[in-house]
Curated annotation (Swiss-Prot):
Expressed in excretory cells, coelomocytes, head neurons, hypodermal cells, germ cells, oocytes, sperm and pharynx (at protein level). One of its GO terms (biological process) is protein deubiquitination. It is an enzyme of class 3 (hydrolase). It comes from Caenorhabditis elegans. It comes from the Eukaryota. Signal peptide: none annotated. It is found in: Nucleus; Cytoplasm; Cytoplasm, Cytoskeleton, Microtubule organizing center. Keywords: Calcium, Cytoplasm, Cytoskeleton, Hydrolase, Metal-binding, Nucleus, Protease, Repeat, Thiol protease, Ubl conjugation pathway. The active site is at C579 (nucleophile), H1134 (proton acceptor). This is Ubiquitin carboxyl-terminal hydrolase cyk-3. The keyword Calcium applies. The lineage of its organism: Eukaryota, Metazoa, Ecdysozoa, Nematoda, Chromadorea.
């Protein structure tokens, strides 16, 4: 059976063969181990896998782990299955192997009396939730499991509960709203506004299973508004009214203090069943068809389905499923004969794929099945979606693919006869894409050919935006990265850009003039190039010189019906990541005096004469003027500004590459180019007089006198002189239109004396901005078991735990010395306390920025004795039998799960086990169901009685709440229990406590909804609003003018010493056209990168009065004439423009697309550049 021992050097102990090992285990155990081993990809187990999957992550010292691995592997680098089986069974089941192993390796001596368990026995300690639910209801374990599968598909996955919205969706609009709402309240036993799975199972059992009188009695809860399980006179009156009970039959007995118990209603209902039949029938239909309960018999299924179909046949549902009439008739006959029905068979109405695009490319829509052409009403029946899903669960489907036909019921506008009908034949869309391969010559600037990408079967009522969203979801694209085109001819010109997202596909299909029976249409999904930002179709148009046609310009009902007749309403083709240029040009073009200047041929000739050397600025200006002329000629719907972009490339290296750039920088650069060429032109026409009069010494003397005069000159005079000098040196139309004046003051912080400097500006850059604060929400848990309260705080990013404790103490009224902060990850793991894990308290100096993302913060009240080692954190825990294949029972035989709120357990010198248990029970009384309610919708277990003992066991565990906190790791102990008696308890340092729940008590007495209940302090809403609320233009200007203390001291003439100064920037004078730059991009020093502030800035489109923020206001107001928006990130975002037309209408200018929008449709959220025009007071 075994071999002789070898030396410790290769760490191999005597083993048995794999064949011998099989005789010590059952066939089921062998299959389990074999299945668990098959999960390893390479057919063997390496050291890391051995530590995790076999040893279960237990904190065994490294040396012993290595020794065990060598024993299992026979000294090899990996473990084969035979070696695993023989070693595992030998150590767990064979006494001779165990004794020889221990003799050789004394450090494993504890395995002599208690060897590792190969298999964990299944007993009540590890009973599953399904078994508990089956035990207290009339449902089997399999029925509970099946219900859970359905519940997962209809509930809110984030919280695993049914809210009212999800409840209505599950019912599919097939029942009266009032009835659905009241039945929801019946299922919601704890009245928290949600139905958890336990409530669903128990209520379904009460309504649909067991003795009929009990089921009928539960129906009375529909009218039990106050949830006291009794019907008052008012509730009885409402019941009689809803059921249309005549007065002579209003005879429900009142057996409980003048009120009717549920059983009284049940007795009355059996005697007067004709009044309650409809309500009870609807409850059965909802329970079985909508919520997933399988009918007990074929007779019951036939009854439920017949009543449901009769109810739903005339309902105005928007969506139906199509089923073959033949199978439906067969189903009915089988159920009537008490035979098992065949699976759903729609082959009789299923169409072919011969001419379908689904046979060539993938389908991205939910369905791709086609119906046979020319079906008549007798070929099929329509059924509500909930019934179709129920049939799938109960009977399955004969066809593995293309078996489901979900169709919409549409208004008459979608059909030739203008009558509402079922859309039997949806549109089939073939989606083309650009070939991702390089062109034959290897360049990127050649138009790509179109190729079939995918298809979709969608309703005519679907809008362009909805179809585009479907495509972007499939490709995981962001906003602005894709758009749709209507294909007229593949790989030829004439495709139509679908820029009107509200347009439905029926309108597009009708515009093609195809016959009704075709039902096919080709669309192009254009995706922007990731690296260059180029739109392939705009590149095609640019190279070919062809026009791009947008659907909005062709729509008969569009107000912008003929953009070619409207000056300036022209799109600009983006063929090289030039959206920042296009947006800037469209905005700047709305400055009427500047545009009119360049439209005048004489002015352009003057610029050419004044810039004879034709410098870079002149070239850019001339090309800009040509571009404006083409835009205002309005002979084209869109223009490819090739020559202008070439001039930009030659003028500056800044914009040479095809990467994304800043629209504000481009506008500033373009204005500077325009100004330079205008200035040179003016200078050549009006040369300035010679300035060479006088000597250099005279000039120096004049300069000294000027400096002396500055000291006594008033700010008004200084500003006027500075402005006059600036105008004289920068004479141009750009200066007249765009230049304003700022005042920069340095204020002595000691004597308050100040000095001013005046500076010109052409755009006002305003901070939004990035606040150096983070938002924290902390749940304060009191020891008296009251409902926890959540507080909100905004703290600086360098705050520590101590700062958080301080503000929590002030808000909650708990002294700081009686608070501990605990951080729990989204997986229920408490954050490490300190490097040596000697304390349960997070260190005050720990930065809050170290908390993981999505973590929950708790502030727990400590007991009166608050010494460092006089309290412990307790966590709820459950041990559940592992039904999945595992290798070693001691480490993987059950699953350890943590849940719920952490608790604080006090440890004074005289603490006993009973005192610990009572302390935990006291803190949990809020979410424990204490009394057994005789009217509940389920049976009750003896453990629910408060006199049956504690429903949990307190165990000493390690800081991870996985293993024992005091036993050696080789014992594989999950936690030593604390006895609930009067004996004193010793709890080692760094040893928290686990609250191990008995399964039945956990599933029946622990109310998870109440445990999660939390009251919000007003500070939560207040801090949230402050943190995420939109800013305003006024607030941004105020931040712009906030004092900033300089780093270095400056000599003060009045103080006669160096003093600290505050620098204050204010607006002295505004220009005719004010460009405001909202600084969304700033450098984040903590993260070492540029970041974007996405906060919305509210600003007026009309009647903006800047007077409160201007030192010398003139009483004029401003009106917004254009704005450039940015979406996405700096390196891969997209710019668009909104601008006013000559007719004072707002236009959306998105590269080549131009569409008229209302003022309300102007998107302010992404505003980046604002262009305001002054409205002078007459």
């Amino acid at each position: 059976m075994g071999n002789t021992l070898t030396g410790r050097s290769n760490a191999i102990a005597p083993i048995i063969s794999a064949e011998d090992a099989k005789t010590y285990i059952s066939d089921e155990e062998y299959r389990r181990i074999r299945q668990a081993f098959q999960r390893f990809k390479n057919g063997c187990i390496n050291y890391d896998e051995f530590c995790y999957h076999v040893l279960g992550g237990a904190q065994i010292p490294e040396e012993k782990r290595r020794l065990l691995f060598s024993f299992f592997s026979h000294g090899a680098e990996t473990i084969s299955f035979d070696n695993l089986l023989s070693s595992l069974v030998g150590l767990c089941r064979v006494e001779e192997v165990q004794s020889r192993f221990i003799e050789e390796y004394h450090e494993f001596a504890s395995w002599g009396l208690s060897p590792p368990k190969l298999t964990i026995p299944l007993n009540d300690s590890y009973i599953s939730f399904y078994e508990v639910m089956s035990y207290v209801t009339h449902l089997s374990v399999n029925e509970v499991i099946e219900l859970e599968k359905v519940f997962a598909t209809i509930s809110d996955r984030a919280v695993c509960k049914l809210n009212e919205e999800k409840w209505k969706q599950a019912l599919g609009g097939c029942f009266p709203d009032s009835y659905a709402e009241r039945l929801f309240a019946v299922f919601d036993e704890n009245r928290d506004g949600q139905i958890d799975f336990r409530e669903l199972v128990c209520t379904l059992s009460a309504l649909c299973r067991g003795p009929l009188p009990g089921r009928i009695s539960q129906l009375a809860r529909i009218w039990d508004v106050d949830c006291d399980k009794l019907l008052s006179d008012e509730e009885l009156s409402n019941m009689y009214k809803d059921l249309n009970v005549p007065e002579e039959h209003q005879t429900v007995t009142k057996s409980s203090n003048g009120k009717s118990a549920l059983v009284d209603f049940g007795i009355w209902a059996q005697e007067n069943e004709k009044y309650v039949n409809e309500y009870y029938s609807m409850a059965l239909q909802i329970g079985h068809i909508c919520l997933g309960l399988r009918p007990e018999s074929r007779k019951m299924e036939l009854q439920i389905v017949n009543e449901f179909e009769k109810r739903a046949s005339e309902l105005p549902l928007s969506e139906w499923n199509i089923v073959a009439s033949g199978w439906h008739a067969e189903l009915r006959s089988f159920l009537e004969a008490d035979k098992n029905p065949n699976p759903i068979d729609n082959s009789g109405i299923k169409g072919t794929r011969e001419d379908s695009w689904t046979s060539k490319v993938a389908c991205i829509s939910a369905e791709s099945a086609r119906l046979k052409p020319d079906l008549i009403p007798s070929d099929y029946i329509r059924v509500p979606v909930p019934l179709w899903r129920a049939w799938l669960r109960w009977h399955g489907c004969a066809l593995t693919v293309d078996s489901q036909f979900t169709r919409k019921y549409l208004d008459g506008e979608f059909f030739e006869d203008n009558k509402p009908a079922l859309e039997l034949y949806p549109l089939e869309i073939l989606l083309l894409g650009h070939d991702r391969k390089k062109s034959q010559d290897g360049t990127e600037n050649t138009p790509r050919s179109l190729t079939s990408w995918a298809c979709a079967q969608v309703s005519r009522s679907m809008t362009v935006d909805e179809l585009l969203a479907l495509c972007k979801t499939e490709l995981r694209l962001g906003d602005g990265d894709a758009r749709l085109w209507q294909v007229v001819k593949e790989n030829e010109e004439g495709n139509v850009l679908l820029d009107d997202g509200a347009q439905n596909l029926h309108q597009l299909y009708s515009s093609l003039g195809k016959t009704k029976k075709v039902n096919k249409m080709k669309l192009l999904l254009e995706v922007r190039e990731r690296g260059t930002g180029v739109w392939p179709e705009e590149l095609r148009a640019s190279l070919s010189g062809k026009q791009i046609t947008a659907a909005s310009t062709l729509s008969s009902n569009a107000q912008l019906s003929d953009s070619s007749g409207r000056p300036g309403a022209v799109g600009l083709v983006n063929y090289g990541n030039f959206c920042y240029r296009n947006a800037g040009i469209q905005c700047l073009a709305r400055v009427s005096p500047l545009t009119q200047y360049f439209l005048d041929e004489d002015n352009l000739d003057a610029i050419k004469r004044g810039n004879l050397r034709r410098g870079d600025a002149a070239e850019t200006t001339i090309e800009y003027a040509k571009l404006l002329r083409e835009m205002w000629a309005a002979k084209k719907k869109n223009i490819a500004p090739n020559d202008f972009n070439d001039a930009i490339r030659l003028s500056s290296d800044m914009f040479e590459c095809s990467e994304q750039h800043d629209c504000q920088e481009f506008v500033a650069f373009l204005l500077d180019q325009l100004h330079t060429s205008m200035y040179e032109s003016n200078k050549s026409l009006h040369p300035s007089p010679e300035e060479s009069e006088g000597t250099d010494s005279n000039k120096l003397s004049d300069s000294s006198k000027k400096k002396e005069a500055d000291k006594e000159e008033a700010d008004e005079e200084k500003a006027e002189r500075s402005w006059t000098e600036y105008e004289k040196q920068n004479e141009s139309l750009v200066t007249q239109l765009f230049t304003g004046q700022l005042r920069s003051r340095l204020i002595c912080r000691t004597c308050q004396s100040s000095s001013s400097v005046f500076e010109p500006f052409t755009s006002l850059s305003l901070p939004i901005g990035f606040e150096d604060v983070d938002l924290y929400q902390v749940i304060v848990v009191h020891r008296d078991g009251r409902i926890p309260r959540r507080y909100g705080f905004r703290l600086s990013r360098d705050s520590k735990v101590g700062n958080l404790r301080e503000v929590v103490a002030v808000s909650s009224g708990i002294s700081m010395s009686h608070l501990t902060i605990q951080c729990m990850s989204s997986k229920g793991t408490l954050m490490s306390r300190s490097p040596n894990h000697r304390s349960s308290n997070l260190r005050d100096e720990l930065p809050l920025s170290s908390f993981p993302s999505g973590a929950r913060l708790y502030a727990l009240e400590l007991p009166e004795s608050t010494g460092e080692d006089q309290w412990r954190v307790a966590m709820h825990r459950k041990l559940q039998y592992n039904h999945e294949p595992y290798i070693l029972g001691s480490t993987a035989g059950f699953i350890v799960s943590r849940f719920g709120l952490p608790l604080i357990v006090g440890l004074d010198e005289e603490v006993t086990g009973k005192k610990l248990y009572e302390d935990v029970m006291y803190q949990m009384h809020r979410f424990m169901e204490h009394s057994v309610n005789s009217s509940s919708s389920r049976a009750h277990d003896p453990c629910e009685d408060e006199n049956s003992g504690y429903p949990f066991t307190l165990c000493l565990v390690d800081p991870n709440y996985e293993w024992c906190g005091q036993c050696p790791a080789l014992r594989f102990c999950r936690g030593c229990p604390i006895r609930p008696d009067e004996s004193k308890v010793f709890i080692p340092a760094n040893c928290p406590i686990a609250v191990d729940w008995l399964p039945i008590a956990l599933y029946l007495r622990y109310n998870h909804s109440q445990e999660q209940a939390c009251e919000d302090d007003p500070s939560v809403a207040e801090t949230w609003s402050r943190h995420f609320a939109p800013s305003s233009l006024e607030h941004c200007i105020e931040k712009f003018s906030c004092p900033e203390t300089l780093d270095a001291a400056i000599q003060c003439d009045r103080c006669e010493k160096k003093t600290m100064r505050d620098k204050v920037m204010t607006i002295w004078k505004l220009p005719k056209y004010l460009i405001i730059h909202l600084k969304r991009f700033e450098f984040l020093r903590e993260q070492g990168r540029m970041g974007k502030c996405k906060r919305t800035v509210n600003f007026p489109l009309k009647h903006f009065d800047p007077a409160p923020f201007v030192d010398k206001p003139d009483g004029n107001t401003y009106e917004c004439i254009a704005l450039a928006n940015h979406y996405g990130q700096l390196s891969c975002g997209h710019f668009i423009a909104y601008a006013k037309s000559n007719e004072d209408k707002w236009l959306l200018l998105n590269d080549c697309s131009v569409r008229e929008v209302s003022e309300e449709e102007v998107d302010k959220q992404g505003a980046y550049l604002l262009f305001y025009e002054r409205k002078d007071v007459k």
